[in-house]
Every structure is written in C-alpha cells, then in structure tokens.
Amino acid sequence: MQSLSSSAPTPEAILEWLQKEMGYRQLGPYNGSSKSHVPSIDAIRKICRGNMIPIWNFLINRVKSEKTVERIRRNITVHGGSSNASIGSSVNPGKEESKSKGRRKDKTVTGESSSYAEDREAALQERELAAKEVERLRNIVRRQRKDLKARMLEVSREEAERKRMLDERANYRHKQALLEAYDQQCDEATRIFAEYHKRLQVYVNQANDAQRSVNSSNEVLSSLSANSEREAVYSTVKGTKSADDVILMETTRERNIRIVCDLLASRMIERIRNSFPAYEGNGICSLPELETAKLGFEYDGEITDEMKTVIVNSLRGPPLLLQAIAAYTLRIKTLISREMEKIDVRADAEMLRYKFENNRVTDNSSSDVSSPLSYQFNGNGKIGTDTHFQGSNNQLLERQKAHVQQFLATEDALNKAAEARDLCHKFINRLHGSADTATHSFVGGTTQSGSNLRQFELDVWGKEREAAGLRASLNTLLSEIQRLNKLCAERKEAEDSLKKKWKKIEEFDARRSELETIYTTLLKANMDAVAFWNQQPLAAREYASATVIPASEVVVDISNSAKDFIEKEVSAFFQSPDNSLYMLPATPQGLLESMGANGSTGPEAVAYAEKNAALLTARAGARDPSAIPSICRISAALQYPAGLEGSDASLASVLESLEFCLRVRGSEACVLEDLAKAIDLVHIRQDLVESGHSLLDHAFRAQQKYERTTNYCLDLASEQENTISDQWLPELRTAVQNAQASSEHCKYVRGLLDEWWEQPASTVVDWVTVDGQSVAAWQNHVKQLLAFYDKESLRT
C-alpha cells in the first residue's frame, strides 16, 4: 500500500484539479443540503487507490479545461517550441517541486528569449499585416459577391421579363388560333344547322304530302314509318372541291335514288356514245333516224336485284320519288352550270380552229379532276386522272402557241411565195423587154445606157430582196426568241419545283434519321433498364448478405453471450455462502463494520476495511463475477446515503461526475441494458430490412412503369414507322417519278429544239404551196432566172 500511495497522485492535487481545471463548485440550489460542501481529502483518498490510480494519473495529466487549452494553443502560436517549459510548468500546478522547477525554467527562458524579442515583434507585425491583408481581401470578396448578386438579380429579372413576354406572345398566338378554330367550327356548325333545317323542312313537306295524299293506305303509312326509322341515320357527302365547301345531307332513300339515277345516266351515256359516233367527234351518222331506235332500253335480265329493290321501295311513295328525282335533277343542273362557268370559250374556239384548220384531230384537254361530273364528261367513262398527262392546261397552251407560230410561218411563207412569183413575172417581162431592145440596139445606138439602167434596177431589186429576207428572218428570230424565253421560264419553273421537291426529300430524310436516332436511343435505354432491373435482386441479396445477415448474427451472438453471463451471475449468487455479499449494509458505518474485522475499532478497522476493499477491487479487475455485486452495493451506498455527513455527500457527487471513466463490470442492470440495446438494434435492423423490402417494391413498380412507358414509346415508334412506310414513302416515290417525268419532258423539248435548229429554213413550211409549187421550188426558180438574167446581161 505504501508503494501504491507513493506513486499515486495526492488528494490535494486531485482537489486542486477539480476546482481549477474541471471548474467544480458548490451546488447553488442545494446550499442547505448535504451536497453543498467540497469533498474532504479523506474521502478522495478512499477512491484514489487500486485500479483508480492510473485513471486519476491520466485525468490529472491529460484532462484540461477549455481555458487552459486555449492559453496553451496561444502560447504555442506566439512563442513556438521555446515555451515548452512554461507549458510544462502550467500543466502540473499541484506539486511543489514542479513549481520550483518551473520558476527556474521560466528564468532561463526569459534570459534566452531576450535575444528573440525582435523576432517575435517582427512575427507579430507580420501577423498583424497578414490579418489586415486578409481583412482587406475579405472586404473585396464581400463587395464582389454583392456586385455578383446584384448582377445575378438583374439578369434573372431580365430573363423573367423576357420569359413573361414570350409567354404572353405564346398565349396571344394560342388564343388567336383557338378563336380562328372556334370561328371555323361556328361556320361549319351554321352550315350544318342550315342543312338540318332544310332537311327538316323537306320532312315537313313530305309529311304534309303524305297527309294530303288521297290514295294513302295503312301499308303506305307503315312503310313510310319504317323508312323514316331507317333514314334516321344520315350520311354526309362533302364536295370534292375544297373551295366550294358543299355539304350534302341526304337520307337513305335519296341516296338510293341518286345511285339509281347515276347508273341510268351512265347507261344512257354509254348507249348514246355507241349509237352516235358524232357524240365524241369520231364521225357523222348518215341515217340518224335508224340510230334513234337504238336508244330504247330493253332490259332483259340486266336490272340487278338491288336496283329492283330500290325501284319497288321508291314506287310505294310516288310523290316522294318525284321530289327526290327533282332534287337530284336540280343538283345535276347546278353542277353542270358550275362546269359551264369554268369553260373558256375563247380557248375552246382556238382549239377547234387549230383542230380543223390542220385537218387532224387532237386530244381534248383534261377536265377538272375534282369535278363531280368527271365520270359523265370524260371520254369513254374514264376517270379524270387517267387522261391527266394526255391533255392538260399546259398542253392546251402549247398547242395554242404552236398554232400561232404555224400561222405566222404560213403567212410569212405566203408572202415570200407571192414576192417570188411577182419577181419571176417581172424578170420574164424584163427579159422579153431586153431581147426587144437588143434587136434594136444597133439602130438606136443607146445599148450602153440601157444596160447601165438595167444593172441599177437589178441591184436595187437584189437589195430589196435581201432586205425582205432579212426582215423575214428577223421576225422569225424574234418569234423564236420569244418561244425560247418561254421555254426557259418553264424550265426554270420545273427546276424550282424540282428543288422544292428535293428540299422536301431532304427534310424527310432528316426526319427519318432523327426518328432512327430516337428509336435506337430508346431501344438502348430500354435494354440498359432491363439489364439494370435484372441485376437488382442479385444486388439486394448481396447487400443483405453483407449488412442485415451479419447484423442479425451479431445480435444472436450478443444474446447468447448475455444469456451465458446471466447464468454465470446466477451461479455465482448461489455459490456464495449464505449470500453474505448481497446482504451488505446501506450506510458507510455499517459498511465499515461489515468489511472490517470483528471486534476491531479505530484505525485498525479502517485499515482492515481498506485491505478488504483492495482485494475486492482486485477480484473485480480479474473479472471475478462475485465481486461485481459488492461493488454495485458500495456504489449504491455511496450515491444514495441516508443521513450522512457533508463530506460523504460531496464524495458521492464527485463519483457521480466521474461515471464517464468508470468501466461497467457487468451487473444485472448492465446486462439488461445491453440486452435492451441489442433488442433495439434488432428492431432497427428489422426496420432496415422492411425499408429494403419497400424499396424493392418501389423499384418493381418503377420498373413496371418504365416498361409501360417503353412499350408506349415502342408503339409510337412503330406507328411512326408505319406512317413513314404507308404515307411518306409513297409520296416520295410519286415526287421522284414526277421529277423524272419532268426531266424527260425537258429532254424531249431540248431534242425538239435541237432538231428544229438543225433543219434549214426551207423545210419549216414545206407544205405551203402557191400555184401548185412550194416555197423551195419558187426559190430555185428565182435562182435559175437570176442566173439566166446575169448570163444574158453578160452577153450583151
């Protein structure tokens, strides 16, 4: 014990450490109680022995207050490593020898530090300068932050204003589009209501006619009611032309009557076409009276059952049949009048003039494709689109231009032929006149002057002929230049149309590439998501094997160890003789009597009790379970005294403050507390497992949602692909075919132009004849006469 007390810290040092470092003070609200006094030195000596000695050494040497720690750090910062001795002197203020040594070291340090005073001052000045610089930089950074925040606010305000303006514009455009759509819907609804009103008026008239009919019977009334029930479903037929915007509302009866009338009209047109060739301009019938008899319709099994049913149902109500036929006739008349308004009489006259002046029949121009009379007015019952490339407005214009050019060429050829004929007659007369003058030249003696005059006249005639030829060639060139300019303009239009189509093709290709990119991206994302969610169960199993399962195993091990520890405690309790360790008194005096020797009093009893306490502490340090209940009882006796003096109460408060450094030695309460902590840990880990399950469920739901989204994207992509393959690709092929056709037409026109350019001028109008001879013949005749006249003039 003496060796232990010599190495152990003194109670005075412990008390000074409590007051200075730990800030131990008297309890204010308990001034009158037993806990208001400072613990005595004897009480501190009782707890500073055994296993508590190294703990008190560690606490006194290592545990310092916040003020001391701050002072030590400041000294280290200012003085550096030279002040270690002063720090050492401030660490152990409880010992007298350390105080004297600290004073001597302070004197030596003061002597040595005089040489470093200037260095310290320089360091302090540098530190102050650095602090000022840091403060200045902080102010600069703070000011720049304020400027940056102000600029960010300004930018955000401008962005908000711009976004607001864009939103307002978008809202205005949206409202405008909605109003336009609503206006259009209102117009359509107005037209539909007007048609409904018209149809209702027709029904009212039909009902009035049915009531006023004299020959009405119950059968007719029943048939009318049945038909009216069947006619409750309307069929809407829109006009083929978008400009007319015709909406036709008709019942089932009227539709059937219209179909029958159309069929009868088509049969009548076919019969007239076959009977009268002049109907199509193919010939003239010599005996029209015989052909008239062919117009009679003799149906021998040609009427279909559907037509018979419609006719029988219509004949049950003759007034209604007549009204329907009249309405159909009025509609056909209106359509015919509209078609007649579209006809250009002047163009037709030019076409007929060109047709019959050139003694050949050309194809008629195609009718309007969108016309509802295309079947009746197209030749041989063909649809208007079948003859679209045979005759069109462009071809009609080409024929008109060709007719004008042919007419100009004909007039020019006729003028040239007439001039050549007049020149021939003049040359013949001149030749006859020159021969007469040649016979009499020897008489008159004036041959030289006459030959000069004739030479001048020939020169003048030659110049006039050349001028006329140049004039004609100039006119021809002007007409050809105009035609070529028109061809260039048409070719430019064709090139522009081809460029537009090519631009559409490029746009289509760009959209197709974008769709392909989107499709591949979605497919890749889908595959990645499928792979990720397929790996989730494995990852969850691995995570559980790494976290939850080991934690559960640890809990099981802790429970087993706690169970073993409880069994050891119980066995120790039963092994103790008469359970005397658990029957310790609850007062310090009784504790001293029970731990001391029987019959001993005074210091001997205290020494014997201290010896027994040291042995008990050693047993507890050796992990002997039988010593733990005694220590717990002693702690309870010290912490909850009954009528003790002030020193023992202060000792109990000190022990309460030192609970953080007393290691629990495994009492029943500690075991139960550990078991409760283990159970709480199990519950926490069960909650973690449930959270993991909920996360897995959420992940499964998210996977299903993502699969639905992916399926929707795939369906949308397939729909877009079908749209591309069904609509865009045929349109693209049609555009390419049209471009190829336009290119072929341009090549054909270029070939015609080259062919015309290679031909001589005399072959342009070789079919024109004057007095039975062509222009080339007359020109050759003129050349022969000129040569003969030159020969005769040379002879003379």
UniProtKB/Swiss-Prot annotation:
Keywords: Cell cycle, Cell division, Coiled coil, Cytoplasm, Cytoskeleton, Microtubule, Mitosis. It is found in: Cytoplasm, Cytoskeleton, Spindle; Cytoplasm, Cytoskeleton, Phragmoplast. Part of the augmin complex composed of 8 subunits. The complex acts on microtubules and interacts with gamma-tubulin in spindles and the phragmoplast. Disruption phenotype: Lethal when homozygous. This is AUGMIN subunit 5. The lineage of its organism: Eukaryota, Viridiplantae, Streptophyta, Embryophyta, Tracheophyta. Residues 115-191, 462-501 form a coiled coil. Pfam families: HAUS5. Involved in microtubules reorganization during spindle and phragmoplast development. Residues 80-92 have a biased composition (Polar residues). One of its GO terms (biological process) is spindle assembly. GO terms for cellular component: HAUS complex; phragmoplast; spindle microtubule. Its main location: cytoplasm. Belongs to the HAUS5 family.
